[in-house]
């Protein structure tokens, strides 16, 4: 019986390239925050969601799977990247099982929800596993500027695609699993229609403070100020995914606290971390200001690079959060901001401190998913060969101009 199951599995895996080729021809369909809310409103239809997801999830999976294959062979050959590929193939095949199923069958809908939970759990470790693949590549082959550029481009798109896929899965499973989250009864799936920005700020600060106190035995205080330009003197609320905002803020607080404590080791008091939340007609901006000594300008963009992490390589079985050891906190946080058309930027003054600004869309109709699509433009990016720069590179030693004198 075991060999029969193996035969069937191999037969289904053989069909994967055909599915990838087919679904990658379609572009993903980005949803706005308002559409997510409408999808999950009180009259939400599970059949409609099922019909949409069994087409949309394969499109998103297939698009990014085509890009995985464009990575350098030396990256694709690492055990970790091959493992991630196998997860994506299996998840695509899992959804294919429902392509011709009847949405009127309640058992089918229940099985689909169970399949989505299985897929979500299967992909829980995608980020650290892919990060391990990058480390395996670097340890074996060292640094290659062209490959590094392609890997950075790919990982931004790959992780953003992953965020979007988990968003779709979470919305469906949270809304249609037949239960209500007692801690957040008014949430629609993972979305809070009336998210208090300051409350999320305080939650992220409290958790970061807990870690900082545990490690350094001290932590800076928090000061929050709100400016509501659209409705003066009213607390600032928005339609957003609190877990996404928390992820961004928690990462920024950790960085700000560490910098503040380490740059004021000899001081009796620590300067506070200041938060400014401003709501305008288009943007909701959150600025975090610290007095942690700042970062040189040349290092700012490197903080968002997957290839230049200064964090120590995590060791298996040492406990803690694996992601922390890869130095991916800031790059992933910026992707969470960009996912709904926002951004995360750092402005630093070396010798003083750093301002980190999260930009989000104020209106739910403007908060539209930012999704990678596999097309000729993306393909060409991976074929680009780095050429010589067209700007002078400063020399470390002044030139002897006497050699250029006209005789």
From Swiss-Prot:
EC numbers on record: 2.7.11.2
Keywords attached to this entry: ATP-binding, Kinase, Mitochondrion, Nucleotide-binding, Phosphoprotein, Transferase, Transit peptide
PANTHER family: [PYRUVATE DEHYDROGENASE (ACETYL-TRANSFERRING)] KINASE ISOZYME 2, MITOCHONDRIAL, PYRUVATE DEHYDROGENASE KINASE
Gene encoding the protein: Pdk2
Transmembrane regions listed in the UniProt entry: none
Predominant localisation class: mitochondrion
Catalysed reactions, semicolon-separated: L-seryl-[pyruvate dehydrogenase E1 alpha subunit] + ATP = O-phospho-L-seryl-[pyruvate dehydrogenase E1 alpha subunit] + ADP + H(+)
Domain Histidine kinase: 135-364
Induction: Up-regulated by glucose and palmitic acid. Up-regulated by PPARD.
Tissue-level expression: Detected in heart (at protein level).
Modified residues annotated as Phosphotyrosine in this record: 215-216
Enzyme kind, highest EC tier: transferase
GO MF annotation, one: ATP binding
Record family assignment: Belongs to the PDK/BCKDK protein kinase family.
Subcellular location: Mitochondrion matrix
A GO cellular-component term linked to this record: mitochondrial matrix
Binding site for ATP: 251-258, 290, 309-310, 325-330
Name of this chain's protein: [Pyruvate dehydrogenase (acetyl-transferring)] kinase isozyme 2, mitochondrial
GO biological process assignments: cellular response to nutrient; cellular response to reactive oxygen species; glucose homeostasis; insulin receptor signaling pathway; intrinsic apoptotic signaling pathway by p53 class mediator; regulation of acetyl-CoA biosynthetic process from pyruvate; regulation of calcium-mediated signaling; regulation of gluconeogenesis
Biological role stated in the UniProt entry: Kinase that plays a key role in the regulation of glucose and fatty acid metabolism and homeostasis via phosphorylation of the pyruvate dehydrogenase subunits PDHA1 and PDHA2. This inhibits pyruvate dehydrogenase activity, and thereby regulates metabolite flux through the tricarboxylic acid cycle, down-regulates aerobic respiration and inhibits the formation of acetyl-coenzyme A from pyruvate. Inhibition of pyruvate dehydrogenase decreases glucose utilization and increases fat metabolism. Mediates cellular responses to insulin.
């Amino acid at each position: 019986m075991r060999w029969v199951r193996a035969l069937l599995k191999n037969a289904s895996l053989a069909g994967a390239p055909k599915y990838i080729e087919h679904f990658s021809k379609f572009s993903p369909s980005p949803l706005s925050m308002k559409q997510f809310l409408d999808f999950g409103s009180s009259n939400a239809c599970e059949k409609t969601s099922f019909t949409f997801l069994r087409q949309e999830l394969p499109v998103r999976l297939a698009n990014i799977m085509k890009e995985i294959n464009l990575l350098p062979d030396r990256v694709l050959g690492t055990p970790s990247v091959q493992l991630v590929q196998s997860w994506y193939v299996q998840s695509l095949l899992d959804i294919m099982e429902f392509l011709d199923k009847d949405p009127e069958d309640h058992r089918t809908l229940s099985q689909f929800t169970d399949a989505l939970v299985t897929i979500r759990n299967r992909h829980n470790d995608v980020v650290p596993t892919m990060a391990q693949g990058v480390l395996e590549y670097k340890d074996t082959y060292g640094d290659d500027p062209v490959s590094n550029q392609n890997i950075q481009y790919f990982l931004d798109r790959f992780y953003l695609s992953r965020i979007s896929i988990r968003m779709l899965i979470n919305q469906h499973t949270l809304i249609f699993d037949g239960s209500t989250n007692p801690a957040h009864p008014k949430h629609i799936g993972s979305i809070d229609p009336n998210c208090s920005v300051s409350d999320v700020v305080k939650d992220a600060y409290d958790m970061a403070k807990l870690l900082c106190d545990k490690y350094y035995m001290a932590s800076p205080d928090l000061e929050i100020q709100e400016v509501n330009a659209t409705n003066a003197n009213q607390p600032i609320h928005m339609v957003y995914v609190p877990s996404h905002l928390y992820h961004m803020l928690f990462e920024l607080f950790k960085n700000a606290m560490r910098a503040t404590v380490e740059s004021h080791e000899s001081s009796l008091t620590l300067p506070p971390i200041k938060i400014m939340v401003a709501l305008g007609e288009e943007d909701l901006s959150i600025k975090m200001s610290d007095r942690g000594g700042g970062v040189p300008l040349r290092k700012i963009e490197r903080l968002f690079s997957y290839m230049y992490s200064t964090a120590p390589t995590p060791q298996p079985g040492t406990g803690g959060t694996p992601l922390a050891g890869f130095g991916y906190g800031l790059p992933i946080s910026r992707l969470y901001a960009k996912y709904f058309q926002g951004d995360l930027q750092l402005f630093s003054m070396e010798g003083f401190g750093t301002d980190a600004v999260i930009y989000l869309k104020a209106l739910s109709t403007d908060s539209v998913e930012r999704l990678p699509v596999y097309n000729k433009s993306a393909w060409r990016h991976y074929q680009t060969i780095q050429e010589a720069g067209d700007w002078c590179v400063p020399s470390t030693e002044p030139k002897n101009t006497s050699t250029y004198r006209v005789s």
